[in-house]
């Protein structure tokens, strides 16, 4: 963890240095940036460390970070020296990440054990517990140093499918006397088709990974002309569908936001809804019923629907998408910072830059969620994420 904290601190210092401007008068806060920067070169300028380069070869890295004279006005040359100095330190830290990341570990370690990396951390003597990228903060959460961070998650839903088939005797050749609910969802989107070959409510639940709040958008989409119906027993059937979304009323489509088995909030009709903290979303849908059939709202292809012999069956399809969803961060959730960490992983920390690495797909999501050599995978992901917070 102390290498992560050192990277956090140096990244924050880099942002402060880049926040200055040459040939302008410095206020008190900006002069403190000079002092904080000079503290590093005074300890590490000219020192050399043997660490792994991008092809996993131990290479001598020498820090070139000149000390800047204190002044109320910083020159262009001094500014360039500061900028190149902090970049030199970050380059060495990148090599330290490759070196430390190559060492397997089974538990979260508070101190670095790799000798050359330990020497670098001790020389820099600069640490910060938190990073701007939430992935880098997970070790501090696991060790109870900080509370779990509230993040905007990109994948609140478990990947799942639904194939819910209910039927009565005398199944029709076109899906009559069958109620079929077919669909799938993952990440933050899902698509479901509900075919009503008989008067019966479609009811199913979408599980969230953890208690989450946010916004959900639900919209009807054109339904398929013909679908395969996977029967629980016997040969599969097919359903010839007719889209009846034009006759759907708000009460025909209900969404229950639930905390376990308790209903927290209910909305009716498609649209955009803000939902409270919940871990389940239950849909209750009735595309067609006897009342609509008696009111002659169907077409000629829906004659004898109640008897199960109609040429076509009423159906609707809809898509739902969760947006701006917030929850407590953990290893299962992908936040908006994950692509930035992945970019750094693909450029400076590719798989060949480690002398030893876990046997998983080389991407941030696989490292965070792997059950194989879990702590080692997570350590590498957090180290890369801490470095990825740099400008």
UniProtKB/Swiss-Prot annotation:
Main location: virion
GO MF annotation terms: host cell surface receptor binding; structural molecule activity
InterPro entries linked to this entry: Rotavirus_A/C_VP6
Cell location: Virion
Record GO cellular component, one term: viral envelope
One of the GO biological process terms: fusion of virus membrane with host plasma membrane
Coiled-coil region(s): none
Keywords on record: Capsid protein, Intermediate capsid protein, Virion
Similarity comment: family membership: Belongs to the rotavirus VP6 family.
HAMAP family referenced in this protein's UniProt entry, alphabetically: Rota_VP6 (MF_04126)
Subunit organization: Homotrimer. Interacts with the inner capsid protein VP2. Interacts with the outer capsid glycoprotein VP7.
Function: Intermediate capsid protein that self assembles to form an icosahedral capsid with a T=13 symmetry, which consists of 230 trimers of VP6, with channels at each of its five-fold vertices. This capsid constitutes the middle concentric layer of the viral mature particle. The innermost VP2 capsid and the intermediate VP6 capsid remain intact following cell entry to protect the dsRNA from degradation and to prevent unfavorable antiviral responses in the host cell during all the replication cycle of the virus.
Protein name: Intermediate capsid protein VP6
């Amino acid at each position: 963890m102390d290498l992560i904290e050192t990277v956090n601190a140096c990244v924050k210092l880099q942002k402060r240095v880049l926040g200055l401007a040459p040939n302008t008068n410095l206020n008190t806060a900006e002069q403190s940036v000079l002092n904080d920067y000079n503290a590093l070169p005074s300890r590490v300028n000219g020192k050399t460390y043997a660490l792994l380069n991008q092809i996993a070869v131990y290479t001598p890295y020498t820090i070139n970070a000149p000390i800047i004279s204190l002044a109320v006005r910083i020159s262009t040359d001094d500014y360039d020296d500061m900028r190149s100095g902090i970049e030199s330190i970050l380059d060495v830290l990148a090599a330290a990440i490759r070196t430390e990341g190559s060492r397997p570990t089974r538990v979260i370690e508070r101190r670095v054990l790799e000798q050359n990396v330990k020497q670098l951390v001790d020389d820099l003597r600069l640490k910060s517990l938190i990073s701007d990228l939430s992935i880098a903060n997970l070790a501090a959460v696991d060790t109870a140093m900080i509370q779990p961070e509230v993040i905007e998650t990109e994948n609140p839903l478990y990947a799942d499918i639904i194939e819910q088939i209910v039927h009565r005797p005398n199944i029709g050749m076109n899906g009559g006397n069958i109620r079929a609910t077919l669909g799938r969802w993952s990440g933050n989107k899902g698509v479901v088709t509900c075919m009503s070959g008989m008067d019966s409510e479609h009811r199913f639940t979408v599980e969230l990974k953890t208690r989450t709040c946010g916004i959900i958008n639900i919209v009807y989409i054109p339904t398929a002309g013909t679908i395969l119906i996977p029967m629980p027993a016997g040969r599969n059937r097919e359903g010839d569908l007719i889209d009846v979304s034009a006759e759907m009323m708000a009460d025909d489509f209900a969404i229950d936001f639930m905390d376990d088995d308790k209903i927290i909030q209910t909305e009716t009709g498609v649209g955009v809804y803000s939902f409270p903290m919940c871990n389940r979303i239950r849909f209750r849908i009735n595309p067609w019923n006897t009342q609509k059939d008696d009111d002659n709202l169907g077409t000629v292809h829906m004659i004898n629907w109640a008897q199960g012999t109609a040429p076509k069956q009423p159906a609707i399809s809809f898509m739902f998408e969760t947006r701006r969803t917030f929850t407590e961060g953990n290893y299962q959730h992908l936040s908006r910072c994950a692509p930035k960490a992945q970019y750094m992983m693909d450029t400076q920390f590719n798989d060949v830059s480690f002398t030893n690495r876990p046997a998983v797909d080389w991407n941030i999501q696989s490292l965070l969620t792997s059950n194989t050599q879990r702590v080692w995978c997570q350590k590498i992901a957090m180290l890369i994420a801490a470095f990825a917070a740099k400008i």
